[in-house]
Amino acid sequence: MHSLTATGDTRRSSWLRVREFAVPPSMIESATARRQVGDWAGACAAARVDVDLNLRSVAATHGRQCAAQLRADLRHLAPDLLRWHLPRIAPDGLLRPGLTIPLASYHPAGPDAGGVHLVARTAPAWAAAGQRISLALWAGPGSRGGPGPHPHPHPHPRPDRRFRLDLHRHLWDARSAGDLRPRSGADSWPAGGPPPADQDPAGVVPAGLDCAVHRWAAEAEILLRAEGRAEGRAGGWADGWAGGAMAVRLGPRSRVVLRLTPVPAAEAGS
């Protein structure tokens, strides 16, 4: 696989080329064919995704409802789409190692049930696992089926808060794949041209870095609500909303912190 800088191509075209190697058409076709006939395990095998969970054990430990929700998600999981969108690192575009990424959360009944998460894991950097991905369940400490006293074999077994694919189902769930275009801001982006001049009113994005700034407030609201830190509708740039701060990563050494404010009820309804 060529490095991202070997041929002098742009960053965008380089990442597209990386994915052509990492998720070839043959993988997409095989995984899709298996998924469409209900063979989610076969789809995972075609996309080189290992399954480290047992639905019968899930039903016994967390209840039938949790197992049914998990089964429905697995039936609609597009493992090739998941592989396409997982975080990668330069210069060779390999999967970022040692990650545990949440895909979905379930809440079994019972006072001590806790939360159960479907997660995707990438192998540690030292493991001879190639570019394989694994699916597993993570139950928080103190919950039924939670981690035991022994160290977990994965270096970072807890879901990583930096990569919330449970809030971005369009990156792995075939039922939500159509949401990619509006969630990425493409619906209001001029075809083949630069972003609209009014999309960055605060002037926070460096020149030449095309970002869908007009989506930041809405995406921040989704994240803040999921973490229980939102109290209203996000939509402003001014300071003053306690707990409404969000950091946006613009590059390896560049971040901007935004603080959102709720839109007044009268304005939000107009």
Located regions from the model:
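C-terminal structured domains
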Residues: 232, 236, 249-270
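DNA-recognition helix of helix-turn-helix
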Residues: 244
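N-terminal membrane-targeting/anchoring modules of bacterial envelope and secretion proteins
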Residues: 1-220, 224-225, 234, 238
